[in-house]
């Protein structure tokens, strides 16, 4: 059976610095399949997060997506039609994504309103998604403000809000950053479970090759905004083809006193 695929095609994003045009994402194409996790890796500043922002039309001021499109099974979608309905997002710093003066219930209701999915009795929808995200004491959590919650709880709540959209694809930008190792593992296990149970397709932006090894099916490597290598995860770790990929894998292995075979 053919899996539904989200394809980023020929994406280019540029900015102007000191009167000179600078390319931040350079004619990038890649595909994310439902039921699989594609890790987007590279050094800091390689264009990982910018790729997601450009694909979803949420670029910072001064940056323009000058070319490219996003399709699902060959059908092109405008960025505003993708966001929420077809692609949900979770961010690397969940604390900054929540309004500090509003409760988790407020955030859930606002999410449903923005998606046009608010029913007369939304409680069941909210509870179901929170439990799917591993949050059990739902009544208490819904009454909390962001400052009353740990980073791990906020990340799970962000995942729950993403699940409210029922989108088939998820862009996860550094979802384990600033979390301790135990919480990191729980978040990774949760994402893996959601892929299996909900057939989610995930584009996982990360600099952590340990996360890649644990979670990804496939890996795309960026360097200065260009896609330089894409392969199944085992091939990336065992036989990386590009020098930049070799450097990333070697640096990861050196943390454990290991070396990449020549």
UniProtKB/Swiss-Prot annotation:
Q: Please tell me whether the keyword 4Fe-4S is annotated for this protein.
A: no
- Any one cellular component term from GO for this entry? plasma membrane
Q: Which Pfam families match?
A: ABC_tran
Reactions mediated catalytically: Ni(2+)(out) + ATP + H2O = Ni(2+)(in) + ADP + phosphate + H(+)
Residues binding ATP, per UniProt: 42-49
What keywords would UniProt list here? ATP-binding, Cell inner membrane, Cell membrane, Ion transport, Membrane, Nickel, Nickel transport, Nucleotide-binding, Translocase, Transport
| Stretches assigned to the ABC transporter domain | 6-249
Q: How does it sit in the membrane?
A: Peripheral membrane protein
The cellular location(s) given in this protein's UniProt record come to: Cell inner membrane
What are this entry's molecular-function GO terms?
ABC-type nickel transporter activity; ATP binding; ATP hydrolysis activity; nickel cation binding
- The EC number on file is 7.2.2.11
InterPro entries in the record, alphabetically?
Answer: AAA+_ATPase, ABC_Ni/Peptide_Import, ABC_transporter-like_ATP-bd, ABC_transporter-like_CS, Nickel_NikD, P-loop_NTPase
What function does this protein fulfil?
A: Part of the ABC transporter complex NikABCDE involved in nickel import. Responsible for energy coupling to the transport system.
Task: Please give the subunit comment from the record.
Answer: The complex is composed of two ATP-binding proteins (NikD and NikE), two transmembrane proteins (NikB and NikC) and a solute-binding protein (NikA).
The similarity annotation says: Belongs to the ABC transporter superfamily. Nickel importer (TC 3.A.1.5.3) family.
Q: What is this protein called?
A: Nickel import ATP-binding protein NikD
Supply the source organism for this entry: Brucella abortus (strain 2308)
Provide the organism lineage as a comma list.
Bacteria, Pseudomonadati, Pseudomonadota, Alphaproteobacteria, Hyphomicrobiales
In the UniProt record, the gene name given for this protein reads nikD
């Amino acid at each position: 059976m053919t899996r539904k695929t989200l394809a980023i095609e020929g994406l280019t994003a540029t900015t102007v610095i000191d009167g000179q045009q600078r390319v931040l994402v350079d004619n990038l194409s890649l595909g994310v399949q439902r039921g699989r996790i594609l890790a987007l890796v590279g050094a800091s500043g390689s264009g990982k997060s910018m790729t997601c922002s450009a694909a979803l039309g949420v670029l910072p001021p001064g940056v323009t997506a000058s070319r490219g499109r996003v399709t699902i099974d060959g059908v092109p979608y405008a960025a505003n039609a993708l966001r929420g309905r077809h692609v949900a997002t979770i961010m690397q710093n969940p604390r900054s994504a929540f309004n500090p003066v509003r409760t988790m219930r407020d955030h859930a209701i606002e999410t449903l309103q923005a998606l046009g999915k608010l029913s007369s009795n939304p409680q069941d929808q909210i509870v179901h998604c929170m439990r799917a995200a591993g949050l059990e004491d739902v009544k208490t959590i819904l009454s909390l403000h962001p400052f009353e919650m740990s980073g791990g709880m906020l990340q799970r709540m962000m995942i729950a809000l993403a699940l409210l959209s029922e989108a088939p694809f998820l862009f996860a930008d550094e979802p384990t950053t600033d979390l301790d190792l135990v919480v990191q593992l729980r978040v990774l296990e949760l994402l893996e479970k959601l892929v299996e149970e909900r057939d989610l397709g995930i584009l996982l932006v990360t600099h952590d090759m340990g996360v890649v090894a644990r979670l990804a099916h496939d890996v795309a490597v960026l360097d200065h905004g260009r896609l330089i290598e894409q392969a199944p995860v085992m091939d990336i770790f065992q036989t990386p083809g590009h020098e930049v990929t070799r450097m990333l894998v070697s640096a990861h292995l050196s943390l454990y006193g290991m070396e990449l075979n020549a």
